From Swiss-Prot:
Region (G1 motif): 46-53
Name used for this protein in its record: Cell division control protein 10
GO biological-process terms attached to the record: cell division
Family affiliation: Belongs to the TRAFAC class TrmE-Era-EngA-EngB-Septin-like GTPase superfamily. Septin GTPase family.
Binding site for GTP: 46-53, 70, 164-172, 235
InterPro entries linked: G_SEPTIN_dom, P-loop_NTPase, Septin
Domain Septin-type G: 36-286
GO CC terms in record: cell cortex; septin cytoskeleton
UniProt subunit comment: Component of the septin complex.
Keywords: Cell cycle, Cell division, GTP-binding, Nucleotide-binding
Superkingdom as given in the UniProt entry: Eukaryota
Length: 356
């Protein structure tokens, strides 16, 4: 397996003081997950300078991503604990234009999981990518970036993100969102959309709100401010203050809920049932094709070997025949010479008898 990065930033177990939501997931999520904890593997792709580290560290209320990381694949793996419930969180970042290394990484993690499934030990870490946050630039998307999103959407749950939403007016932001939706539709890019179950009670309204606001436009901040008598995460400007948790101003809270509250289990299940199963199917098809190719090659080699042996056998038979013919000629010649000699002797004897 190639392009598997080493863990460059491991903070171990982090007990967070500001709840992010995974310890109070809905009843629809398996009870066993509440006991054993949760796993989430997040891939973040996009140009450098769009606020990846600030966004991720804000979502999980922990310093998971280092601002000094490289543009190549960088992985962090940690455990964060909220109200005695743990979340095993893996963050992989990548900021180059060519996403071949990312696709190789996704396939390598799928292959690792596949190999572990075939082994004796069934308890192993799930390192497959559960969701990809694709950070969109404020200027025009390039053809390469559109292609990148399409290819990623074929391999994992893609969630396009409009970062730094505070640089737009409400009307501008509405236009940006509509433009992104149009690009996704025109290029057959299927982003992750939560399943809306009308029988989920209050959760139905919450999920409907999340779906209606996609693609998400977010504002992130790791800084806490005292504002209006409260300690709030937000951003200060000359003209005022933005509380990033306020859903009227941006979709940060909706994105956070999607990842670690309302749809955490759906992301992992879709990874397993759709993307990973597609990968397994390809592996089996390749192995079957390889088996057929090996069988065909074996038959060709066997046929060729028999032909060579037959050719050698026929050549040997011909050589023996030739040798036999030569021996036949040799003995025939010797017999002829002997007969001639015997005839000559007989003539001489007969002649001597006449003389006497």
């Amino acid at each position: 397996m190639k392009n598997i990065p080493t863990i460059v930033r491991n903070l171990g177990t982090i007990n967070i003081r500001n709840n992010v939501g995974f310890s109070s997931v809905p009843d629809q999520v398996r009870e066993s997950s509440m006991v054993k904890g949760f796993e989430l593997n997040v891939l973040v792709v996009g140009r450098r300078g769009l606020g990846t580290s600030t966004l991720i560290n804000s979502i999980f209320a922990a310093p998971l991503v280092d601002k000094k990381r490289t543009n190549n694949i960088t992985a962090t793996r940690n455990e964060i604990v909220e109200n005695d419930i743990s979340l095993e969180i893996s963050i992989v970042t990548y900021h180059e234009a060519n996403i071949s290394p990312v696709l190789d990484y996704i396939n390598a993690m799928n292959r690792e999981y596949f190999d572990n499934e075939q082994g004796l030990y069934k308890a192993f870490k799930d390192n497959r990518v559960h969701v990809c946050l694709y950070l969109l630039p404020s200027d025009t998307l390039t053809d390469q970036e559109i292609k990148n999103m399409y290819e990623l959407s074929q391999s994992c749950n893609l969630v396009p993100i409009i970062p730094k939403a505070d640089m737009y007016t409400p009307d501008e932001l509405a236009d940006v969102k509509e433009n992104v939706r149009q690009i996704l539709s025109e290029n057959n890019i299927f982003s992750f959309v939560p399943y809306l179950n009308e029988n989920d009670g209050d959760l139905t309204e919450e999920v409907a709100d999340i779906v209606g606001c996609m693609p998400f436009a977010v504002i992130a901040s790791e800084t806490m401010y005292e504002h209006g008598g409260e300690i709030i995460r937000g951003r200060k400007y000359p003209w005022g203050f933005i509380n990033i948790d306020q859903e009227e101003s941006n979709d940060f809270k909706r994105l956070q809920r999607l990842l670690i509250y309302t749809n955490l289990d759906e992301l992992t299940m879709k990874t397993n049932h759709l993307f990973y199963n597609n990968y397994r199917k390809k592996i089996f098809e390749i192995e079957n094709d390889c088996g057929a190719m090996k069988e065909a090659r074996y038959l060709r080699l066997r046929t060729e070997t028999i032909r060579i042996l037959n050719d050698k056998y026929e050549s040997r038979i011909n050589a023996l025949r030739k040798e036999e013919e030569e021996m036949e000629r040799f003995y025939s010649e010797k017999i002829r010479e002997m007969n001639d000699k015997m005839g000559e002797i007989s003539k001489q004897v007969e002649k001597s008898l006449h003389v006497e």
